[in-house]
Structures are given as C-alpha cells and as structure tokens.
C-alpha cells in the first residue's frame, strides 16, 4: 500500500493506444506560435479507497474511526478477524546475515534444535554457515526457523521468528509475526504517528484489512514488506501513539458480503476519491467507489502545479511525430485522465493517463494540461495607429493576461486580460502605438514574446502656392529629424534635399523654392521605431 508522502507504484499492463503516424485525413491545428505546456492537478496516489489526509481531516472534525471507515468504504461492516499471525517476506537473495542480541535457537527441517549464543550468522543457498561462536556448523536441512526472546535482526530488528528456505540458488527470509505486532510497525510507516487517535485507528483497521485481503495463505509468504503490500518498518518504526491505535482496534477488519474487504488507501485525493474501475480498468467493486473527500484540503498535495514543460520535453515523453502543437485529455467518471492525445505536425499519439503520470512523475492522474501559445506577428512594419490582432491558444489555464514592454526595458506591464473562446483560442485587438514586445501569461507561465515593428505615421503635402512642403509626424516625437527627399526622374533614386526637425506639436515644414518632381518625407526616430515614410507628393 502507499507509503505516506509517496504514491503507490502499481505496474499496470494496459493495452497500448498507438497512433504513431499521420493518417490520410490528419490535419494539424493551425498553431504558429511555440506552445508552452502546463500541467496542474490534484491529489497524490491512486485515489482508490481511503485518503489518509481526508481521514485526518474527518478526525479533526470529530468523526470516530468507524464513521470515517464507513465513508470511504461504503457498505462494509466492521468485524473481527480470527487470524493471529502473518508472514512477511524480508528478502529473496543469494545471502542474508541475521543476528540476535541474546541467546537464540535454530530448528531445522528435521525438527532438530540448536541453541546459539548472541551474535550473527550469514546464510547462503547451501544452508551451511558458521555459528556465532565460530564453530563450523553442518549443512542444515531447510526450512530453518530462528527464535529468540529479543527481536531478531535483519538489517533492523523485528518481532517474531525468522524462517529461511533455499531453492539452491537463492534463499528466502520470511518473518512470521503476530498480526497485531505486525501492525505496530505498519501503521507508523504509513501514517504520521503525530496524527489524531481516530485517524490512526482508521489506518490500523484499513491496514489490518488490507493485509488479510491480499495475503497469499497458500504461498511461502503472505505479504511483502514494502509498497507492493504495505511498508513494514520493524521494531524501529514503532511508536506509542500508533501502538495504542492498533490495540484500541485489535482484530478489527472491514468485511463485505462476509469477506475481508480490499481496503486500498493512499495519501491525498484532491477532493474526491476514485472508483477502482476508473483507475485500474477492473470490474466495479461496490465499496470502492468515488466519494467526496471534503477535508482533504488539509493536505499540501490537495492541489499541485502548475508544472511547466517545454515542447521538446513533452515531445520526447509523448512520442509525437513532428513538432508538438497540442495536448488534449479525456477524463472518466472519477475526473481522472483516461487518455492523453498528443498532436504534432506529422501525426498524433495517444497514451493512457497512467502512462503519462509515470513518464512525467506526476502525483496523480487527476490533472489537466494547459496549453499557452501566442502566434508571432509577421515581420512587416505597421504604421502608428494601425489596428491588428494577437492570436493564440490558452486552454485550461487561469487568469490569462496580455503584457507588453518597450525596447530597452526589462519590466513587463499588464496591458489587459485575455478572454478565451470555447475552443481555447483567443484573438485580441491591439493598436500599433509604439515599438513593443508582447507576451501572454498565466501566473508565472509566459509565452515567448513577439515583436511589433512600428513606423511613425508621416503626412506630407504641398502648400497652395507650391512654395512649401509641410507635414506632421504621429505620434508626436519632438526634435525628431525629418528628411525631405526628391526622386530623380531618370534613375528613380531618392536623394535628401533637406533636413528639418519636428516641432513639439509633431509638425515640420520646408520652404525653399521647390523643383518640379516627386517628394516624400522620411523619418528616422529613436527608441526602436522603424523608418517612417510619407506618401509621395508631386509638385509641377
């Protein structure tokens, strides 16, 4: 079962959903910008059964352990088991070293008993070893059972007895321990020992029930000592608070239809648990359904993210052909992600939510994929005051804002909120007011910026008496030099015939006698402006 603060690792053999290449009718979305992908989610763990943080919240609100269990496992009955002991696999390896701090006994497969002094022995598949006093022992016939008054030690101390068997290649070490003493070491390994008594009692019953529901009574051992079953920390893990919770619920198990209930548990639901058939594609189980988890908000993992991923990272993980353009999800009845569809320029690929969770190291399958992209502006020059639109995609992300900054400055300034259409796209009307960079943000997530190239709007006309060229520059840029240019009628080339400065009102004039021909005004402004040109004016 789940170790607290760590999601359970379950290996699920799910059928692969493969769409690895473009089909004849495939059409990638018309997205020009580089998308930023943001994943946010809720909860930690598989979400089936009891949420530990939610149980803690119920305890804080005065619920007793039986009421808490009834909420998470609806329809179950609190009963009492007659099982007294359990066998825990500690090792399956080529060699183990075990020890005792006091005298201990060895009984072999022939029922012969050997008393040994305090010390350690190292066993190999031949079951031949030296006794703690250095005496060369004979080869024993397995299985070997070690007992002592003090806890036996394999890396750490354990209650109960050790049994060693060999298949000729590896030896198996199993700890047989009274069921309640097993729970003394499990409950504090799965839930913080400082939590309220009713939460710890809830954990004790869930752990006891789970152990008996999954035990392999016909095999060489019943349960593993790690997350494949439940974490069993030995004597060192025990705590007075959790021991008291075990003792207060001694023998207590949940049953359904007269059978021990399979009481999965996990860290954090995010606000709602999941039905077993939504998580592992198994048959529905009446007491493992999706239920509200209102007090789960206490958990630091109730909500998580946003986690930003580059297109390159997701492209590799999601195995999409071509540049990654979009990621879409489908969810099941428990609000968990069933499938993830990655869309690239050359095709798409579909994975399960569980596969994506594992590949990206997410806390749960209750997540959403936000996509944020801003289409780059074309590399053309717009005149001051021209209207244009900024377009892009901003799906499944909160509080989108358009930001801008001026050339030479580091600070981004919020220009306006961005409204999203039903399909996640946006189109924002903007006027070219100055050379600027734009980006769209959601919290700390930002698109790559796009530059707006703007030229001053320059107007030029000739006076009625044909003696003066006059005009204006917008926006007003006082002191900006204006070049008056004349076009050579033969070559078509432009030559500057005069330079004047724009006034504080943005106006300029040139009064020398005019030659016949075509004129224009050319403005080169500082501050990142593009060259501004007036329309041509003909004098003649």
Predicted feature residues:
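Short aromatic-acidic-glycine turn motif
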Residues: 408-410, 490-494
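Exposed beta-strand face motif in extracellular beta-rich ectodomains
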Residues: 434-438, 480, 515-519
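Signal that preferentially marks extracellular ectodomain short beta-strand elements
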Residues: 428-429, 509-512
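Glycan-association/targeting regions that enable binding to alpha-glucans and other polysaccharides
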Residues: 468
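Residue-level detector of high-confidence beta-strand sites
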Residues: 415-417, 496-499, 511
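Conserved, single-site charged/polar hotspot
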Residues: 2-465, 475, 483, 504, ...
């Amino acid at each position: 079962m789940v170790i607290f603060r760590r999601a359970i690792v379950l290996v699920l053999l799910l059928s692969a959903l493969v769409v690895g290449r473009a089909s004849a009718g495939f059409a990638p979305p018309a997205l020009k910008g580089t998308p930023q992908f943001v994943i946010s989610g809720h909860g930690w763990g598989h979400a089936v059964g009891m949420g530990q943080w939610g149980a803690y919240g119920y305890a804080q609100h005065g619920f007793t352990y039986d009421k808490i269990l009834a909420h998470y496992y609806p329809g179950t009955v609190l009963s009492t088991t007659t099982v007294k002991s359990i066998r825990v696999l500690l090792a399956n390896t080529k060699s183990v070293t075990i020890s005792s701090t006091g005298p201990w006994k060895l009984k072999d497969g022939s029922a012969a008993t050997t008393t040994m002094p305090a010390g350690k022995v190292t066993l190999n598949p031949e079951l031949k070893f030296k006794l703690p006093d250095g005496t060369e022992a004979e080869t024993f016939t397995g299985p070997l059972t070690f007992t002592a008054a003090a806890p036996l030690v394999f890396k750490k101390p354990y209650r109960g007895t050790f049994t060693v068997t060999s298949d000729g290649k590896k030896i198996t070490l199993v700890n047989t321990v009274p069921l309640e003493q097993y729970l003394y070491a499990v409950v504090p390994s799965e839930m913080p020992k400082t939590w309220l008594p009713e939460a710890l009692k809830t954990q004790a019953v869930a752990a006891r029930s789970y152990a008996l529901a999954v035990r392999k009574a016909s095999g060489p051992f019943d349960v593993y000592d790690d997350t494949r079953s439940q974490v069993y920390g030995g004597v060192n893990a025990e705590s007075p608070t959790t021991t008291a919770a075990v003792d207060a619920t001694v023998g207590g198990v949940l049953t359904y239809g007269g059978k021990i209930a399979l009481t999965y548990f996990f860290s954090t639901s995010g606000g709602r648990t999941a039905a077993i058939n939504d998580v592992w594609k198994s048959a529905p189980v009446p007491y493992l359904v999706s239920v509200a988890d209102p007090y789960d908000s206490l958990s630091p993992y109730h909500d998580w993210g946003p986690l930003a991923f580059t297109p390159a990272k997701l492209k590799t993980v999601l195995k999409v052909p071509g540049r990654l353009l979009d990621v879409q999800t489908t969810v099941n009845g428990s609000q968990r992600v069933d499938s993830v569809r990655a869309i690239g320029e050359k095709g798409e690929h579909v994975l399960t939510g569980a596969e994506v969770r594992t590949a990206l190291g997410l806390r749960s399958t209750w997540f959403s994929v936000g996509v944020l992209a801003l289409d780059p502006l074309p590399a053309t020059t717009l005149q001051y005051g021209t209207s244009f639109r900024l377009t892009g995609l901003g799906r499944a992300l909160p509080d989108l804002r358009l930001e801008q900054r001026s050339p030479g400055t580091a600070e981004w300034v919020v220009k306006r909120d961005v409204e999203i259409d039903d399909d996640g796209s946006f189109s924002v009307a903007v006027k070219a007011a100055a050379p600027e960079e734009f980006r769209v943000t959601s919290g700390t997530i930002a698109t790559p910026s796009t530059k707006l190239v703007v030229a001053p709007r320059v107007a030029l006309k000739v006076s009625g008496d044909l003696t003066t060229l006059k005009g204006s520059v917008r926006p007003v840029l006082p002191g900006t030099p204006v070049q008056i240019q004349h076009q050579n009628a033969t070559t078509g080339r432009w030559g500057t015939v005069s330079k004047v400065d724009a006034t504080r009102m943005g106006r300029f004039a040139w009064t020398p006698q005019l030659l016949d021909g075509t004129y224009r005004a050319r403005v080169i402004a500082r501050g990142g402006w593009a060259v501004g040109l007036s329309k041509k004016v003909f004098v003649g």
